[in-house]
Amino acid sequence: MRKGILLKTAALAMAVVMTFSCSIIAFASEDVDYTINNPYSGVDFGNWDQYKADLHCHTTASDGDVDMDVMIEEHYTQGYDVLALTDHGITSKGWTTVSSRNYFKIALSIADGKLRQITPLTEQRYNEITTGVGRNGRGMIEVPLGIEQNPTSLNNAHVNSWCTEYGDGVVGGTSNYDEVIRNVDETGGLSVINHPGEYTKAKEESCQADAYDESDSWYDYVINKFANILINYESCIGIDINSKKDGRTKYDRKLWDILLQKVIPTGRNVFAIATTDAHQLDKVGCAWTDLCMPENTAENVRACLQNGSFFAVSRYIKNSEELAQFSLETGIDWGTEFEQENRDGSIPAPKATNVIVNETDDTITLNVDHALTVHWIADGKVIAVGNTIDLDDFSDEIGSYVRAEAFGHGGVLYTQAFTLDYDGAPESNVKTTFDFGNILAELKHFIIEVCTSIPLGKEVYDFLVKPVTE
């Protein structure tokens, strides 16, 4: 009881301080002529729908514990509208077709102690799911040609891609982002950098201050490495900021803010998604991406991902400092880890209902259901609390963007960044880097060339990477 009183007192104090601070800022800040670039400007919130998408999950075709048909069915049961099967090194050829490779099936069958089964949907069940049988006609569709690239990476340098067959059966990938993202770009696909906290090892830090500390040579390298990739390849839409149950991505919102500061001044945005990365059924439902579209089609999914007209949503937060901020704003102690295990819809996650940008008044409003608080972030810092932000009140704290987070009993929602053009806007400070993964890629190509040149080497290699079709 005493703890609750203290928290409520702290919340009230914070509200008073922020109100007082805002009045000072409003007096001191300049009236800047902002051009607000709204990623939701083309969305008709009154007539369009938002479609719940899982852009990253696995099946027994690679290292998932769940058979293909069961994974699809679980997503359908939990109300997903869009699903991408993104097995390691295996391009999904559709829900009624087996897609795998011999090396995966052999290795994982040995690990399982039995032959690994891959069961696609029947044509009848496929038609039922895509037409919404049992869901009042609300079907679930597939994102075409999903795959998680770099399947044999030794340091989790993983990249998701869709809408291209590139990567099917391609091995390797340790530290190598540039080659795979370049090839996805050149073959007309889209990509995203998956759970960067695994590759960067930021997930192992004990506090946010140490994660992605640019004074650390390793973090400085990977930050600028990612920034250069995003600048060079616009088909790489951004990064995964909250996946699975957030244990490995808990500091990747900080990375996102750093990348936004570096990349936006070059003329492009960096979008953020949330995914399940489900290998087991208990991960389904932990996160998703709400796609704003007039109709649920593969063409609209692609356009939505390219335009950034979507919201990332998760039921998990493992960043204690973020939760401390939400505790102050709501007067509720959320502890150091937030986990909303409810899956029946009785505790809904925050849902955006409208985004309103007023260029004349330099204001942005996020209308959202099922949220206890909304706050606005600029350059990685919370600068305002409430559904509406007046940019002129915070002009001395704003750089090249603002973004919003909405939090409630059901989880957290992240908007995309609203990029800002104005006189005196920050300039880019991206350092030129070399992707040392390219050296490892060349070494991989050399080893494959040598191995396939010896007697029976090519036959063995071709067999291992041969597609499994049944």
Name each model feature, range by range.
Residues D210-G247, M293-N300:
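Structural recognition of alpha->loop->beta junctions
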Residues T19-D33:
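Sec-dependent signal peptide cleavage junction
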Residues M1-G4:
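N-terminal secretory signal peptides that target proteins for export/translocation
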Residues L6-V17:
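Sec-dependent N-terminal signal peptides
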Residues V468-E470:
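Short, solvent-exposed mixed-charge patches
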Residues V32-D210, E234, D240-W256, V270, ...:
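A metal-dependent hydrolase metal-coordination microenvironment
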Residues S29-D33, N37-G46, M71, T266-A272, ...:
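C-terminal functional module detector
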